[in-house]
């Protein structure tokens, strides 16, 4: 799969830009702040319905504009599709496929798949659990686009349950009427159902990703492993991949009952996939706090390379996006990463200077300056 044309209107710094793209390597080169990352950010948005740089859509719309439009032509084998996303901050986004009638934005998921390497990836190893949960959930959705709906349902149910708990906490503090626990029981069941599905998908992903990540780490840093991926669940007990969804549902709902008193006191849901973490081990020790800066980079690269290999093996090779990542790496890791990604069907690279792009990544070049994109 590869993107053959990218069109942006009022996206970030671009009033309008048209960029034809080829298979193989394409590098966007220009000083920082000129708009090169905006191009690959748009491609990534098509794959995830989100940005790797900001948490909301508002910053993606050019100042003074009401909306932004991302349009891309995509080819997979003999099939070509045109995707369009309209970003409307404060209102519902819109989507179209092949100029058809409007579809839900999440209906475009799976048409474009990407694996993004960026300076922010270091947070996968050194950052908070939320960074690793996002990594897992975006990869889950790339494998199975229907999981976007499950994730959305989980967030909706969690929000409703937290609202109920906050009301109960307020009433308790002010001597009001105690809450009808049967209402909370209903929300426990809803959270347990969608939470068990999300948990099952995460566990399956980690079991599949583990050997790929270990191999990838060895490719990036020969002799530096092994690495180990372990899921730490707030539910407690055994939540291994052999557990059925029904068993996970029973564990999750039982855990909710077990902490109900504390939840009512604090007004927040204390167990569930939103409280879980992916533990990253390196040579039998936790990578967070133990791995050196270079080892942390090798680990982050290994997770992305393993993601790429997983998606590629499942039949729809993703676009590889390397956003200013080479400037963050030492010479050895830079060359190893370049050698590992160059066989990709489509590789998009951004760099401040041409010298940051390893020689093995020869291909099309675009100069990016002051919002202008010109092939060189």
From Swiss-Prot:
Gene3D superfamilies: P-loop containing nucleotide triphosphate hydrolases, RecF/RecN/SMC, N-terminal domain. It is found in: Cytoplasm. The keyword Repressor does not apply. It holds the Pfam family SMC_N. One of its GO terms (cellular component) is cytoplasm. Keywords: ATP-binding, Cytoplasm, DNA damage, DNA repair, DNA replication, DNA-binding, Nucleotide-binding, SOS response. This is DNA replication and repair protein RecF.
């Amino acid at each position: 799969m590869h993107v053959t044309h990218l069109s942006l209107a009022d996206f970030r710094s671009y009033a309008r830009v048209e960029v034809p793209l080829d298979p193989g390597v394409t590098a966007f080169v220009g000083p920082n702040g000129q708009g090169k990352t905006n191009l690959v950010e748009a491609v990534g948005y098509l794959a995830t319905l989100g940005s790797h740089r900001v948490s909301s859509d508002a910053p993606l719309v050019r100042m003074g504009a009401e909306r932004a439009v991302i349009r891309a032509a995509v080819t997979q084998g003999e099939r070509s599709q045109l995707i369009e996303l309209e970003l409307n901050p404060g209102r519902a986004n819109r989507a179209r496929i092949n100029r058809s009638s409007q579809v839900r934005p999440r209906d475009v998921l799976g048409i474009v798949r990407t694996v993004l390497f960026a300076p922010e990836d270091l947070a996968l190893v050194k950052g908070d659990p939320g960074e690793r949960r996002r990594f897992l959930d975006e990869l889950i959705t790339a494998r199975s686009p229907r999981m976007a709906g499950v994730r959305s349902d989980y967030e909706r149910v969690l929000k409703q349950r937290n609202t109920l708990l906050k009301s109960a906490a307020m009433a308790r503090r002010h001597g009001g009427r105690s809450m009808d626990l049967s209402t909370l029981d209903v929300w426990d069941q809803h959270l347990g159902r969608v939470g068990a599905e999300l948990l099952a998908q995460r566990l399956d992903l980690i079991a599949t990703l583990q050997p790929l990540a270990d191999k990838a780490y060895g490719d990036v840093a020969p002799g530096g492993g092994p690495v180990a991926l372990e899921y730490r669940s707030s539910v407690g007990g055994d939540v291994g991949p052999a557990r059925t969804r029904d068993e996970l549902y029973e564990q999750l709902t039982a855990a909710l009952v077990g902490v109900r008193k504390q939840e009512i006191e604090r007004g927040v849901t204390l167990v569930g996939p939103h409280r879980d973490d992916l533990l990253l081990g390196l040579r039998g020790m936790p990578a967070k706090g133990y791995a050196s800066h270079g080892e942390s980079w090798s680990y982050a690269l290994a997770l992305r390379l393993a993601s790429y290999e997983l998606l590629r093996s499942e039949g729809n090779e993703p676009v590889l996006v390397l956003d200013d990542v080479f400037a963050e790496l030492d010479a050895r890791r830079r060359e190893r990463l370049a050698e590992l990604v160059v066989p990709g069907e489509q590789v998009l690279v951004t760099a401040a200077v041409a010298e940051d792009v390893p020689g093995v990544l020869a291909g099309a070049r675009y100069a990016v300056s002051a919002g202008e994109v010109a092939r060189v």
